[in-house]
């Protein structure tokens, strides 16, 4: 059973709404809803009811809450007990997708450096398919990337669903990517063809028979965002990668469907690989950072 679902439930109780819980956990509101629905299915009970503007625990939910607090306390105790007596050392080879490396990994690295200062960390940004193969071929110890399939030989820890968003500058807000059979006289700005969110976007356009003027390939997410802001075209990126630009109005979100499409972020290593103290500490830092946001 996924401990994050219990953390989500605890956060909804503390914050009083799914929206505020999603903001605190740095995930989408749909992810919070999904976690609660999974728990309700698991225990065959309704956990929340809406009273006024607040989400309140049902009677059955109140019965479960003390046990959930106890479970999270026990898990914290287990984590402490699992810590190695000696400080982690040696070399650790980590590979990550660019958006995760740029926007989610700095917090991970900060935690890791504080806990494992003796470890020689090798960190590389790679395509998600290449990361999967590097882990399978023992060319890397740990990968933080988006799930792309064919990973049964990996030990995976899912880090949550990351919502994708279609963005443009306010000056080209009149393009339409929802009406089938339409041609948009703008460019699609993205990175390499094997990019996971590029594949999702282009697949959706094919299904809708929508075309664009051309595709511009750039190697960095920052370059993509700067070109979009300069009215050169649109892009399709993880929401967390453009959150600041959306908040300040430099970019706007374009309609792309009734529900946001998502990709699964995960931390993984080869299932047959012995987990070193450095690997254990790094994975722990990844999980803590993603839960904390």
Curated annotation (Swiss-Prot):
Keywords: DNA-binding, Transcription, Transcription regulation. Belongs to the LysR transcriptional regulatory family. It holds the Pfam family LysR_substrate. It comes from the Bacteria. Residues 18-37 bind DNA. This is Uncharacterized HTH-type transcriptional regulator YfiE. PANTHER family: HTH-TYPE TRANSCRIPTIONAL ACTIVATOR CMPR (PTHR30126:SF5), HTH-TYPE TRANSCRIPTIONAL REGULATOR (PTHR30126). One of its GO terms (molecular function) is DNA-binding transcription factor activity. The lineage of its organism: Bacteria, Pseudomonadati, Pseudomonadota, Gammaproteobacteria, Enterobacterales. The gene is yfiE.
């Amino acid at each position: 059973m996924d401990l994050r679902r219990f953390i989500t439930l605890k956060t909804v109780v503390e914050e009083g709404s799914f929206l505020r819980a999603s903001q605190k956990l740095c995930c989408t509101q749909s992810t919070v809803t999904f976690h609660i629905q999974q728990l309700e299915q698991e225990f065959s009970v309704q956990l929340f009811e809406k009273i006024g503007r607040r989400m309140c625990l049902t009677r059955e939910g109140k019965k479960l809450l003390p046990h959930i607090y106890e479970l999270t306390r026990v898990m914290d105790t287990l984590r402490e007990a699992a810590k190695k007596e000696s400080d982690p050392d040696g070399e650790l080879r980590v590979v990550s997708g660019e958006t995760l490396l740029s926007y989610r990994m700095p917090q991970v690295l900060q935690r890791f450096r504080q806990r494992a200062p003796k470890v020689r960390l090798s960190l590389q940004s790679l395509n998600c398919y290449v990361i999967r193969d590097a882990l399978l071929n023992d060319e890397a110890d740990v990968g933080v990337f988006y799930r792309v399939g064919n990973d049964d030989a990996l030990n995976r820890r899912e880090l949550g669903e990351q919502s994708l968003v279609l963005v443009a500058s306010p000056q080209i807000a009149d393009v339409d990517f929802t009406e089938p059979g339409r041609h948009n006289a703008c460019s699609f700005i993205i990175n390499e063809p094997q990019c996971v969110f590029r594949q999702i976007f282009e697949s959706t356009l094919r299904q809708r028979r929508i075309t664009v003027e051309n595709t511009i390939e750039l190697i960095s997410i920052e370059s993509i965002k700067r070109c979009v802001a300069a009215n050169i075209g649109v892009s399709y990126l993880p929401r967390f990668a453009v959150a600041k630009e959306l908040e300040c109005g430099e970019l706007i979100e374009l309609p792309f469907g009734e529900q946001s499409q998502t990709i699964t972020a995960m931390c993984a290593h080869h299932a047959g690989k012995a987990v070193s103290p450095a690997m254990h500490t790094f994975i722990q830092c990844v999980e803590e950072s993603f839960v904390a946001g």
